[in-house]
Amino acid sequence: MDQARNFYNTILKSSHPLLLSFHLAGKAVPIVFYIIGSMFLNFTPQFITVVLLLSFDFYLTKNITGRKLVQLRWWYDSTDVNKDSNFTFESYKQYAPGPPINAIDSKLFWWSMYVTPVIWGVFAVLCLLRLKIFYLILVIVAMCLTAWNTYGFRCCDRWEPNSGQSDGQDTNNWFALPSVPGFENLSRLANIQSFFQRQ
């Protein structure tokens, strides 16, 4: 009971306690529904509900909570084939100094962003061990959505607007494989943006 009260008091110290609560709930609700949903629903409605919850969390994090809690926003434009990177970023770094980012907001935002894909990864391993292929598909969708959002925010956080590089130009180094002679196609496969573009 004391831990719940301490966590509640921590949330109250946030700059945006209601928004931080929605952010954390957006991460937790799909996981909880994935765990207990099979007790009262068949697979199909559970699958649809979890994917809708994940989509809502993706939208909420990408467009609202990321912007308010850590002052970061990103989007991916796959239509512009002339750019080195299709990421576009908005960051507190490119504007005049404003109110500082609350340490509690930042810490809980980043912890939730990094822990959520790991939890879905554990579920993927469990699905493989128990040979639950259909649930594995659901977990892979969840891993992709949460990891892609985390990757976008990580690149946005690392982006330096005054470095002379275009938006997101140097962000793909984090995901690139090491250069191994004879395996150029493998490293191109790891570069996510080139996967969706015509050569």
From Swiss-Prot:
Protein known as: Golgi apparatus membrane protein TVP23
Family matches, as InterPro entries: TVP23-like
Main localization of the protein described in the UniProt heading: Golgi
Residues carrying sugar: 63, 86, 185
Primary role: Golgi membrane protein involved in vesicular trafficking.
Gene name for this UniProt entry: TVP23
Quaternary assembly: Interacts with YIP4 and YIP5.
Pfam entry (one): DUF846
Cellular component annotations (GO), alphabetically ordered: cytoplasm; Golgi membrane
